[in-house]
Amino acid sequence: MVKLRLKRCGRK
């Protein structure tokens, strides 16, 4: 999902 991708990018 896009929401999961955005959260993973922000945590990196």
Swiss-Prot record:
InterPro entries: Ribosomal_bS16_CS. Belongs to the bacterial ribosomal protein bS16 family. Keywords: Chloroplast, Plastid, Ribonucleoprotein, Ribosomal protein. One of its GO terms (biological process) is translation. It comes from the Eukaryota. The lineage of its organism: Eukaryota, Viridiplantae, Streptophyta, Embryophyta, Tracheophyta. It is found in: Plastid, Chloroplast. GO terms for molecular function: structural constituent of ribosome. One of its GO terms (cellular component) is ribosome. The keyword Plastid applies. The keyword Ribonucleoprotein applies. This is Small ribosomal subunit protein bS16c.
